[in-house]
Each structure stands twice: as structure tokens, then as C-alpha cells.
């Protein structure tokens, strides 16, 4: 589909417009403009409504458009190629041309990279346009984000999940109003030759550090190649890339006559059900539902996912609002999900397929979490994992309650009850978080340190309670996900506008601000703790203390092979001394982590460990009295 270069010269073109009477190719090919409705530019139509043609003068970088004549009473005019790999800057969007790009020209360096097991994933969510800004008011690009790869690897995460990167109808955007599903978003692409050379130097330095050959500026000339370069360098440095895709709705297409909306130019623009790709349904998710009852529309979306796998080496997908998709499309939506997941699993079995599904959000299509993650063979939708808000809600509520003072009620037991994700057979099927793009965007809920201390977001109270929240996330079962800036105590809401104050405040780290640098080191060490102890990435968890009066929680993580980890935390404003808890076995238990070591002086702790020699307690065979730092947590392992 779309425009594809042919070995030996020229390109084939193919587009779906079943009710059109004629489709012509127009553009500039080999420096020669070809326009109008002439026989040599007319495509031929097959029995399924697909139009195709070949032009031997077409080549890499050429600009093109399709001219579509609708049926009687319909309209005539240009349409962009729905499969265009890139859009041009020749005219302002949405009236721009498409660009012919080779899908396989990029010189990949990632042959040895393997997508991590789901249980071993630690995800970092970011927005390309604001994550790595170097000039105020100008969105950061795919190549700017490459410069942050060493930072991300030093943090310890092993998956990045950018918000949607395809072309949208309005910029700046979160990315959920997609217009051109196969084209990278304009603002994320570098076109200035001088800037390209600067980025090339960064890329080649990163490649040289890994003993890999350099690239040339021609290798990153296109936006298509720049996104490939981002994924490639991530893989070289051990980072998987999960793409966020939006198949539950299309963009609004306001004033965009060249979009997929009414692609074959049917006369009736009053009924979106006649628009070919869309329906008249809108759940308030940002645009019209896609016509998933149509096999060709379903295949278009499946082809889009395959495109990210084949041409961008995708390691997974976050599927936006699958609950909305199923509600609006009923049986056809269910069929689509099963076709999608089954096809992609056949092509790339290690691919993470993560559904944003909220049971009960739309009661008219009642499916359970287990239905969503059950395999296609067992009658399910076939997704591997889903977003899960149980732990997030419990932790955020507890932190907020604690901020009202030492006499306020704190539901610590809710955290304990949500350590294992409800409704799922396996913990690794839940992607858990404390913050994400939806939760902490401007005008929505506050970031964690603001929840923790509404009057001073960088106080000891804000930092210590935020450490507690991060500790619960990174020691609980599931796939933990961080949101950009969370790792260094970002307290500002985020926004898509590329201007302060709602950008990640990298200057706090560059100026060595204490609260930011200490919290960053805390996050790094806590992530390393998760890597050091496989039990923290396993399935087993047993909360054995959940005392709301004391604001104390304790839980056991273990592997059947014997890796035992005990986590004890509190949201009390006082340190607990001589606090008796159970331990799985008698003997010495080493304190391997203490959140109080990051910003408190003196540190309240257990002098490196405790001797569990007391009587059975909390369902264990031994016990010991420990110190639990105020608004903090400690972690013990055998040894």
C-alpha cells in the first residue's frame, strides 16, 4: 500500500478508494512536475476498490498527491496518501504533499537487541515535543531525544514509551488526534542542515562508544529515518521502544479536505457513516470512531502496527482507550482486537501489547480484565497486559491524606490490597504507575510532591512522601511505569506547549538543586534494587501488615527458589522504633535499602540489618524489632 520504491527504479502506488470513479497520481518526479488528469497518470482499479499504478521516474524524496474524483454528485480534489511515510513542508498542513521514502534504507545497528521479558520491564513515558527542548518555544525532536539516551540508561529503565508520534491535525498536541497514521509529526523532524550535522555528531559519538561504525548525514535526512535513528540508538543502549497508537478514534479533520475523511469523495458529508474510514460515533475521546465493521479499515490499522514493527523495530504498543473502542464497535471491535493481537503475535512473539482498558467505563460492552488478556485461542482479546489503576489510586489517596497532618486518617490497607493487580491472572499483565500523561497534565491532578505537601512542594514532607510513593511502585508486582520528571521530584504539571513552566525542569539537575539530585539518586538506587532482586520482578507478594492507625504497611516478595525480600513502610510523621514484625526465617536480615538515606540527617535505620530471633509473628516463623523511618520505607533481604 502507498508509495513503494522498486529495485531498478520507479515506484508503485496503491490506495483504497472503492467508490471513486477515477484516481490520478500527481507530483514532482525526478524534478519534473506531473499534474492533471491524463491517461498516463490514471490508476487502474481492482474488484475490491483498490487503485494502483507504477511510475518509472519516481524516486526517493519525490513529492506526490492523489487526485480523487468522487461518484456522481460527489467532490473532486487532492487527497494525501493514507500510507505516506512522510509529509512535506512544501505547503502548510493539511495541504502539504506526501514524500516517497524507502522503508528499508536506514543502516540499523540493533541486530543483537532482544525485547525484554514483560516481567523485567521498567517503562518510562515521555512526550517527544517537550522532553528534550533546547530552544524555548520550539518543540524538541526525535534527534533531541537521542541526546537523553545516556541519561535514561543511567536511570535504569529499559523501556521508553513516547506519546503518539504520528502526524496530528493540530500542533502542539498530546498526539491523540492523529490524521496521518504512517507519517511522523512535523515538529519532531529536523530539516535545518546545520542542526542535522550537530545531531549527527551526537549520534556518532554514541555509536563510537559502543564500537559501532558512524553514520552519514544522508542517513538521517528524512523524518522517517530520524524516528528510526531514535529507536536504533535506544536499542544499541538497551532501551526497548513501545509506541502509543490510537485505534479507537480518528482525528476531527476540521478543515482538512485532503485527509482520510470521505476519502473516495462521496457526496453526502452530512453522515460520517459514509466517510469510508469513520462512523458517526464519538465517545468524547477526541474524534469519530473508526469503521471497524469494515475489513479494509481493520486491515489499515493492522498494517499500521506492522509498519511500526517492520520499519521501526517496535518492541510493543500501548493501545489507547480499548474500552472505548469496544463500546463503540461492539462485536466488530472485538474481532478487530483479536485479529490485531493475533497477527502481531505471529509476526513478533516478544512484542508487548498493552491495552488501555478500564472495566466498567462503558457498561454497554461488559468485558472483564481477564477477557482482555486471555489468548485468542482461549476466547480472549489476546492482549498481553493492560493499564491498571488500583495501586495508583491507593498510593495517591494515601499520600494526599497524609498531607493533612498526623491526625488525619490514611487508608494504608488499600495499598496493601492493591499490590497484586485485581482481576488479572499474572502481575506482569498490569502496567502500574503513580503518574502518567493523563493524570498530571495541566488542569488535571497534581504531581506527587504537590499531593504530598500542598504548601511547599520541595519540603521534607513532599520529598519523603514522594519517596514512599515511588517505593511502593518499584517494589510492587507488575510492570512499573514512570512519567518524565517523576524521577527527580518534578512538581509542575506538564503540557504540550514547548514553553516553561510546564516542561521537565532539567535545570534543577544541572544546578545540583538538592531536592532534585537527591531524589534522582534515590530513584536510580531503587531501580537498581529491583534489578538486583528478582523477587521484586516476580509474581509472589503477601502483605502481612496493613495498619491504618499506625500508617504502617509490610509485605513479602519472594521467589520459590528462595529470594526473600521484606518491604516495610510508613506514612507516619514520626519514626517507629522497636516495631515488631515477622520475618520468613530466623537469622540475620540485611537492610539493603532505606529511603531515609536520601535527604534526612541523621538517618533513621537499622545499622545495616537486624537479627530475627523472636517468636513467630505475622504468619512467619520468626520476628524482630526494627526501625521504620518517618514517611519512609526500608527493605530487608536474607544475609
Residue ranges and their predicted role:
Residues 17-19, 29, 47, 57, ...:
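Short, flexible loop/turn elements at secondary-structure junctions
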Amino acid at each position: 500500500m502507498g508509495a513503494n520504491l522498486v529495485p531498478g527504479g520507479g515506484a508503485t502506488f496503491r490506495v483504497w478508494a472503492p467508490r471513486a470513479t477515477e484516481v490520478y497520481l500527481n507530483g514532482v518526479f525526478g524534478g519534473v512536475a506531473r499534474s492533471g488528469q491524463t491517461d498516463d497518470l490514471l490508476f487502474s482499479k481492482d474488484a475490491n476498490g483498490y487503485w494502483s499504478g507504477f511510475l518509472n521516474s519516481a524516486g526517493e524524496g519525490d513529492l506526490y498527491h492523489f487526485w480523487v474524483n468522487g461518484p456522481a454528485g460527489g467532490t473532486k480534489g487532492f487527497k494525501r496518501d493514507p500510507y505516506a511515510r512522510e509529509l512535506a513542508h512544501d505547503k502548510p498542513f493539511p495541504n502539504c504533499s506526501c514524500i516517497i521514502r524507502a522503508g528499508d534504507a536506514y543502516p540499523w545497528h540493533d541486530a543483537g537487541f532482544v525485547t525484554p521479558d514483560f516481567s523485567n520491564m521498567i517503562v518510562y513515558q515521555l512526550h517527544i515535543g517537550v522532553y528534550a527542548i533546547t530552544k524555548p518555544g520550539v518543540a524538541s525532536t526525535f534527534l533531541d531525544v537521542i541526546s537523553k539516551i545516556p541519561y535514561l540508561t543511567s536511570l535504569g529503565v529499559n523501556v521508553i514509551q513516547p506519546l503518539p508520534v504520528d502526524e496530528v491535525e493540530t500542533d502542539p498536541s498530546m498526539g491523540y488526534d492523529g490524521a496521518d497514521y504512517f507519517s511522523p509529526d512535523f515538529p519532531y523532524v529536523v530539516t535545518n542542515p546545520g542542526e542535522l550535522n550537530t545531531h549527527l555528531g551526537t549520534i556518532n559519538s554514541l555509536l563510537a562508544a559502543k564500537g559501532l561504525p558512524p553514520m552519514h548525514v544522508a542517513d538521517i535526512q528524512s523524518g522517517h529515518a530520524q524516528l528510526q535513528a531514535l529507536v536504533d540508538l535506544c536499542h544499541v543502549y538497551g532501551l526497548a521502544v513501545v509506541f502509543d497508537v490510537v485505534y479507537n478514534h480518528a482525528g476531527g479533520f476540521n478543515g482538512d479536505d485532503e485527509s482520510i475523511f470521505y476519502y473516495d469523495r462521496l457526496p453526502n458529508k452530512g453522515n460520517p457513516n459514509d466517510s469510508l474510514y469513520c462512523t458517526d460515533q464519538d465517545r468524547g475521546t477526541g474524534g469519530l470512531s473508526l469503521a471497524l465493521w469494515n475489513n479494509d479499515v481493520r486491515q489499515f490499522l493492522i498494517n499500521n502496527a506492522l509498519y511500526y514493527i517492520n520499519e521501526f523495530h517496535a518492541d510493543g504498543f500501548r493501545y489507547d482507550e480499548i474500552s472505548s473502542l469496544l463500546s463503540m464497535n461492539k462485536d466488530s471491535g472485538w474481532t478487530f482486537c483479536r485479529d490485531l493481537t493475533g497477527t502481531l503475535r505471529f509476526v513478533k512473539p516478544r512484542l508487548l501489547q498493552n491495552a488501555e482498558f478500564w472495566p466498567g467505563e462503558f457498561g454497554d460492552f461488559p468485558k472483564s480484565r481477564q477477557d482482555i488478556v486471555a489468548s485468542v485461542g482461549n476466547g480472549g482479546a489476546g492482549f498481553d497486559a493492560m493499564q491498571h489503576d488500583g495501586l495508583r489510586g491507593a498510593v495517591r489517596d494515601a499520600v494526599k491524606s497524609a498531607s493533612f497532618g498526623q491526625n488525619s486518617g490514611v487508608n494504608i490497607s488499600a495499598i496493601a490490597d492493591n499490590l497484586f493487580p485485581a482481576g488479572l491472572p499474572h502481575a506482569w499483565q498490569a502496567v502500574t504507575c503513580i503518574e502518567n500523561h493523563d493524570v498530571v497534565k495541566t488542569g488535571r491532578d497534581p504531581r506527587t510532591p504537590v499531593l504530598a505537601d500542598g504548601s511547599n512542594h520541595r519540603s521534607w514532607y513532599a520529598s519523603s512522601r514522594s519517596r514512599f510513593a515511588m517505593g511502593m511502585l518499584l517494589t510492587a508486582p507488575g510492570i512499573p511505569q514512570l512519567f518524565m520528571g517523576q524521577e527527580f521530584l518534578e512538581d509542575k504539571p506538564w503540557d504540550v506547549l514547548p514553553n516553561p513552566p510546564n516542561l521537565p525542569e532539567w535545570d534543577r539537575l544541572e544546578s545540583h538543586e538538592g531536592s532534585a539530585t537527591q531524589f534522582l539518586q534515590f530513584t536510580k538506587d531503587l531501580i537498581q534494587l529491583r534489578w538486583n532482586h528478582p523477587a521484586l520482578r516476580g509474581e509472589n507478594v503477601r502483605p502481612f501488615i496493613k495498619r491504618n492507625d499506625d500508617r504502617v504497611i509490610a509485605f513479602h516478595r519472594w521467589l520459590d527458589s528462595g529470594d526473600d525480600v521484606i518491604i516495610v513502610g510508613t506514612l507516619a510523621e514520626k519514626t517507629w522504633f522497636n516495631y515488631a514484625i515477622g520475618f520468613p526465617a530466623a537469622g540475620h536480615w540485611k537492610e539493603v535499602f532505606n529511603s531515609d538515606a536520601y535527604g534526612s540527617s541523621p538517618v533513621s535505620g537499622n545499622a545495616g540489618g537486624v537479627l530475627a530471633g523472636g517468636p513467630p509473628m505475622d504468619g512467619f516463623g520468626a520476628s524482630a524489632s526494627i526501625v521504620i523511618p518517618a514517611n519512609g520505607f526500608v527493605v530487608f533481604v536474607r544475609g
